[in-house]
Amino acid sequence: MKQVCVLGNGQLGRMLRQAGEPLGIAVWPVGLDAEPAAVPFQQSVITAEIERWPETALTRELARHPAFVNRDVFPIIADRLTQKQLFDKLHLPTAPWQLLADRSEWPAVFDRLGELAIVKRRTGGYDGRGQWRLRADETEQLPAECYGECIVEQGINFSGEVSLVGARGFDGSTVFYPLTHNLHQDGILRTSVAFPQANAQQQAQAEEMLSAIMQELGYVGVMAMECFVTPQGLLINELAPRVHNSGHWTQNGASISQFELHLRAITDLPLPQPVVNNPSVMINLIGSDVNYDWLKLPLVHLHWYDKEVRPGRKVGHLNLTDSDTSRLTATLEALIPLLPPKYASGVIWAQSKFG
């Protein structure tokens, strides 16, 4: 039996474990503070559900492990500075940017990037945390410790957000899912919609970009690339060197889920192109209690993470998939009264994708 240790024991590790069971792969999600002696890592392939981690007894051991897949890639992608430098090196389109070293640079920043600046911490920060949208009269809002530790990007006037989830094997082969349409609110992914056939031009551009990134890094496994949709084409926003929230729909909407695909890649199992036959919707459950009335609707698949419910915390998601978009739309309509009011706008956005 193959064994995989996942650095991190959140919902992504949980879903990797679930995906491993039918394949006969024992997946062990482990917390960062676990005692090395209690973790069967010596005979395992090592992967991670997070991009960066503090130094602990366990992470020191894993850092030396020869089967830690992508060990040298994580630091590059975890730092937005080196991530942006990678895009520039490969001549891939991304928002104009620079390192923000000192507050005296602001006049030149706005001269170069325009009236809206997006400031992001180089490391850490997710779901909208560690980011600021600033205009010239708002720069005092930025904490002093951010200078030298943040990049600043041009605010992009985009018409939509999409992500591409793909995987690369040890032999250099790559496979991709169709582009996923995403709705973010307050920096947090709320809803995703995927179709069997994405916009051909966007799909081709996205696959070319993500393939170039994975090949340059020698990356193995699933990677996600978030993009802005603009009249000039796709602009890369950020990368995630792991399974990704916007790929959760693949659990019920694809022949191979992103979690199984990642395990196949890192354990050197066959990596065929996943088949997607029907449209799918994913709704993130954020800071809301479980409601089993959702399951009265036959298209709804509930994925509950068994975490303590707290405001702003991802505690589960709902997947819906069907060949009949009218049935999907009707099911989404029936979900609205079963969800807290804050979900209505995301559900209506998903319905709008079906015309």
Regions flagged by a language model, labelled:
Residues 233-235:
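Conserved protein kinase catalytic/activation segment
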Residues 166-170, 227-231, 306:
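Short, low-complexity Ser/Thr-rich regulatory SLiMs
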Residues 1-85, 104:
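ATP-binding N-terminal substructure of ATP-dependent carboxylate-amine bond-forming enzymes
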Residues 78-163, 167-213:
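Active-site nucleotide/adenylate-binding loops and adjacent lid/helix of ATP-dependent enzymes
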Residues 204-225, 230, 241-288:
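Active-site "cap" helix and flanking loop/linker of ATP-utilizing ligase/carboxylase catalytic domains
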Residues 264-355:
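Peripheral (often C-terminal) accessory segments that flank ATP-dependent C-N-forming ligase machineries
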Residues 96, 116-119, 149-153, 223-224, ...:
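A short linear hydrophobic-aromatic micro-motif
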